[in-house]
Amino acid sequence: MNIMVFDVPAINGGALSVLNDFYNEVAESNDKNINWIFVLSTPTLKETNNIKVLRFPWVKKSWGHRIYFDQFIAPKLVKQYQVDKVFSLQNVTIPHVKCKQILYVHQSLPFVDYKFTFKDNKLFWVYQNIIGRNIINSVKEAQRVIVQTEWMKKACVERTQVDSQKIEVIPPVINLEVKGNFKTSDGSLSTFFYPASGAEYKNHQLILDACREIKKISEKKYKVIFTLNGNENSYVSDLYKQVQKEQLPICFEGPKTREEVFDMYTKSILIFPSYIETLGLPLLEAREHKGFVLASNCPFSNEVLRNYENAYYFDPFNFRELTTLIDSILKKNLSYVSPRIDDTKGINQHLISKVLSEVR
């Protein structure tokens, strides 16, 4: 059997992690009855006796190159290699092919309630209104759909009206080596941490607004740590200028290694105001470290933090709710409790076991 895996968008971040994890599972499966053909852009994966890797780096040059690849090159590859089944890790199916397709959907923008205007964010508007239509049509066309979370499954069913049995939830593999858990101390209960990129939907501004309000009502000492340099884009530059001008207790410490982020979960409180995520990985990571978490009240956070005693929620569009939570912690009106053992057991599964069962 010939199975072709498409993932030309993956070059970094979570998408690349999903690709690498899946490739490793395939490489370790040792099933000689399946020939795997990985179709990628720039990532380099090792070929084996039953794994072939096709790279098309020019796909990343522009949207036009990507559209040309999807509409003409991809279908030709399926026919050229006499593919029996396609596994698409890139949110959309391959057009103009007759073989069965399994679709992995991890782009949440077409399914969230928040709607971007073209003026607010051109790229996200395109994802929601143009690419989003393609993703929704692909969910309808694929024989099987895999998503990372229950909320995504529910949203897919609501938007596409497909049979819910067609969509399966398989959380991504999260390789965590937990070396320590959150410890309460004066330092940890007055340090807040937000590991996130500088995208606007990550909602750093809400934290600034909350800090500005706390400055008016409290003299308690605390600090907030961002994993930003302060010059990533115009949005982040504006955040940095606000912090400097108003002397808010926010530190721009720049990117941190995975190990450094894990260490921060043990000695600070995670603030997560993002309102557009599929999973919200820091939430899961903090929970694994038995951390103290303040999270936006959204479907993804409710799912990842379900039944977790040390998770508190706020409206991601109401800074006063976050202000109240931070102020309550600083005044010791909101306390950390020792979580039950085994809180996160069973959250993660391996993708490959389900995929192989679908493709035989």
Residue ranges and their predicted role:
Residues 4, 185-202, 208-211, 225:
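Conserved donor-binding/catalytic core segment of Leloir-type glycosyltransferases
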Residues 13-24, 199-215:
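A conserved mid-protein helix/loop that constitutes part of the nucleotide-sugar donor-binding site
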Residues 42-43, 223-237, 254:
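Glycosyltransferase donor-sugar binding loop
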Residues 76, 124-145:
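Membrane-proximal helix-turn-helix segments that form the acceptor-binding/catalytic region
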Residues 140-158, 162-179:
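Donor nucleotide-sugar binding/catalytic pocket of nucleotide-sugar-dependent glycosyltransferases
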Residues 237-259:
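Nucleotide-activated donor-binding/catalytic signature segment of Leloir-type glycosyltransferases, i.e.
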Residues 275:
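Aromatic "clamp/platform" in nucleotide-sugar-dependent glycosyltransferases that forms part
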Residues 311-320, 327-333:
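Conserved acidic donor-binding segment of nucleotide-sugar-dependent glycosyltransferases
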